[in-house]
A protein has these predicted regions:
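Long, internal stretches of domain cores in catalytic or enzyme-like folds
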Residues: 1-238
Length: 238
């Protein structure tokens, strides 16, 4: 059994001390928010995972993984003298800001188990930290022009070129999905289609606060994220 991964030793100049640590983290293993319904509707002859929680909610395994990820940081902070060697840190020394309570609780259980540390959960409010683009706090300037420049830099200068360059990945995805269900194919006038056969496009909202890739690339991205979540969640007996 391999030893658990450790954080790199900080490079602190002689005579200096670390006064603050800021960590930015994304979500853990959660139930899907997109493409789950489409996946379940496909007649693929296989049973897909039952998550046992609502869309976007952290699973039990996801909570355990978050705790395991943050526990080494708590140990490292004690070694650095930022947390006491034993017992709980001062609540004034730790602050967590999150968009969901579930991930916040799992994080705190990992970094300082059984300690009552401060946090803030934004919930449904418009929080510029988590949804700056969507809520218009940070609109994209010349979004259409920027999207065109990105597309021009792709293989063959097009989304079709990008799809072609990802051929092996699409072959793997097509093997999992087989032909996509008829309703999806009919949107693109195909009687029986695979994901990579659907034309892709980039759409920019008039307000410049949303850029969406639709078609084959968009679907492939969504399904791939879903499969990553399923793989991370593991078998039912984990």
């Amino acid at each position: 059994q391999s030893a658990p991964a450790r954080a790199a030793e900080p490079d602190v100049p002689e005579g200096w001390t670390i006064s603050k640590v800021v960590v930015l983290a994304s979500s853990g293993v959660r139930a899907p928010t997109h493409f789950e319904e489409q996946l379940q509707s496909m007649e693929l002859g296989r049973t897909w995972k039952e998550w046992g929680v609502g869309a976007g909610e952290l699973t039990q395994r996801g909570a355990g993984l978050i705790q395991a990820m943050w526990m080494p940081l708590g140990i490292e902070l004690r070694k650095l003298g930022m947390f006491p060697a034993s017992g709980c840190p001062d609540p004034a020394d730790v602050y967590v800001r999150s968009d969901t309570l579930q991930r916040t609780s799992a994080l705190l259980d990992g970094i300082a188990p059984e300690c009552r540390l401060g946090y803030r959960v934004s919930g449904e409010e418009k929080d510029p930290l988590f949804h700056a683009l969507r809520e218009g706090w940070c609109p994209i300037t010349s979004a259409a022009s920027a999207a065109a420049q990105v597309i021009a830099s792709l293989p063959q200068g097009s989304l079709d070129g990008l799809t072609e360059s990802l051929g092996p990945s699409f072959d793997l995805l097509n093997g999992l999905l087989r032909p996509v269900n008829k309703e999806m194919c009919e949107r693109y006038s195909f009687p029986n289609c695979h994901v990579d056969e659907m034309p892709s496009s980039v759409t920019v909202s008039p307000t410049g606060n949303r850029v969406v890739i639709t078609g084959g690339l968009g679907m492939a991205s969504g399904f791939s994220e879903l499969f990553i979540m399923e793989y991370s969640q593991g078998p039912e007996d984990w």
